[in-house]
Structure formats: structure tokens, C-alpha cells
Regions:
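Long, intrinsically disordered, low-complexity Ser/Thr/Pro-rich regulatory/activation regions
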Residues: 221-240
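Short coil/turn linker and secondary-structure boundary residues
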Residues: 25, 79, 116-119, 173, ...
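Extended, charge-biased low-complexity segments
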Residues: 62-85
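Aromatic-enriched hydrophobic runs in primary sequence
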Residues: 70, 76, 214, 218-221
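Long amphipathic alpha-helical segments with strong coiled-coil/leucine-zipper propensity
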Residues: 78-157
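An amphipathic, hydrophobic-aromatic interaction surface with interspersed Lys/Arg
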Residues: 1-67, 126-217
Length: 240
């Protein structure tokens, strides 16, 4: 989505295609489910066949991303992944009851019913990708769909996840690390960051990194250093 000011405002995001607002959870709210569960759930909600190789795409060419997603969510073999996605959905729609139907996800609240289905699933993913900047994220993931064809894809993704886990066995601690760095670097109360959204935190962290690099570059130039690589102006746009 192309509305940086709305994302920075921490206001709810209108999901017009489903006639419902998507809540931007704060770090304090996310902490209730933990970063690992949060990012695992986000990856499920952002499922796309585009991550698959040509052979796998061909095998599932008659299935939409939403259909594969629903087969994953309806699987009872790996409840942890389904639960992670459900917890994220609860953060996104805190005033709604969430129910999975055969061909749609139904949100029930005081304003009536809203539906996420094959017609608006891409729009939904576009919003959460922007909210959480998921294109910058690589924490591994797992899929275990009920459908036999999708299950083949799940096995390959599971193997890829296991390889990543062996290369980087540490637990996911992206947001907490950002908070810790900014609290020290900017000399702020660490509790202040708990009211930030993910987009606000990442925006400030990127800007802080750019300013640190820019200030070091200027200081080095003033001290007479030569042959330095140019750095971006810290006030440049950071959201492509």
C-alpha cells in the first residue's frame, strides 16, 4: 500500500475490499504472543506461490494462493502454525470473532460480517506486508497443508526451514533488538517503544542507522580522511 503517513500514524488501516479496518498492533500487544509466533503467523498470512520454483508452481497452477493458504490453515497435523496465524489475526482484528469457512475467512463484529476470500486476499496481504515490512524479513517458515499436492510443496519448504535453522539456531528477536539499540543509541526510555507499531520502529531504526553513518562520514571527511565511500543523506527517502 502507498500511504506512508497512515502507516506512521499508527491508525487502523482501511481494508476497503472487505469493508473492515485492520489494527496496527503495538509492540506491547505483539509481546503477548512473542516475536517468533508473530513472524511465523505473518509468513503464513503472506503465503504466495511466487516463492516456489517453476516445477512446483506448475503442479499447483490450478490453485490460487488463497486456496493453498486455506488448505494450510485447515490442516490439523501442525497446529502450532495454524495457531500462530490465528494469534496474528486476533491482533489485526481485535474486535472481531474469526471463523474459518470452506472458502472464506469470516470476521464477525458489531458492525456485521466481513469476509476475506480469494477476491480480496491479495489486497489483504499487500496491507500486512506494508504494515510489517515483510519483504525485509527472512526468519524461516513452515507449511503443512492438508491437500496432497500442496503437501509436496510443504515438505520442500520444511527442508529449507531446517537448513536455515541449522545455519542460524538463535530464536527470532528482531524487534526486541531494535528496541534495545534505539533505547541506548537515542537515550530513550525503553518503555516508550512499547507503544510503537512495527512500521514506526523499523522506520526510526533505519533513519537512525542512516544518520549514524552520515555523521561518521562527515566527521571523517572533516578530519581529512580520503577515498571514503559516499553514504546516503540521512534525510533521504527510506521507503522505496
Amino acid at each position: 500500500m502507498d500511504n506512508e503517513l497512515l502507516l506512521l500514524s499508527s491508525n487502523d488501516i482501511p481494508f476497503l475490499e472487505a469493508q473492515v479496518n485492520i489494527h496496527q498492533p503495538t509492540l506491547s500487544e505483539i509481546s503477548l504472543i512473542g516475536e517468533e509466533s508473530f513472524f511465523s503467523g505473518c509468513q503464513f498470512l503472506n503465503f504466495s506461490k511466487s516463492i516456489l520454483n517453476l516445477e512446483d508452481k506448475t503442479d499447483l497452477e490450478d490453485r490460487s494462493d488463497f486456496e493453498i493458504f486455506m488448505s494450510i490453515m485447515c490442516s490439523s497435523e501442525k497446529l502450532d502454525y495454524k495457531n500462530n496465524a490465528m494469534m496474528v489475526l486476533t491482533l489485526l482484528f481485535p474486535t472481531s470473532q474469526i471463523k474459518f469457512m470452506p472458502n472464506e475467512l469470516v470476521l464477525m463484529n458489531k458492525n456485521g460480517l466481513s469476509r476475506i476470500n480469494s477476491a480480496n486476499f491479495d489486497a489483504f496481504k499487500d496491507i500486512i506486508v506494508s504494515m510489517f515490512e515483510l519483504n525485509d524479513l527472512d526468519t524461516g517458515g513452515g507449511y503443512n497443508p492438508a491437500d496432497s499436492r500442496a503437501a509436496k510443496i510443504a515438505e520442500k519448504l520444511k527442508k529449507a526451514k531446517n537448513r536455515k535453522a541449522q545455519d542460524s539456531p538463535h530464536k527470532v528477536a528482531i524487534l526486541s533488538r531494535y528496541v534495545s539499540i534505539l533505547a541506548v543509541g537515542e537515550q530513550k526510555d525503553i518503555n516508550d517503544f512499547m507503544h510503537y507499531t512495527v512500521f514506526q520502529l523499523k522506520d526510526e531504526f533505519k533513519r537512525y542507522q542512516m544518520k549514524q553513518s552520515f555523521d561518521m562520514y562527515v566527521q571523517a571527511k572533516m578530519a581529512g580522511a580520503k577515498d571514503l565511500d559516499e553514504v546516503d543523506n540521512w534525510m533521504d527517502d527510506i521507503h522505496p
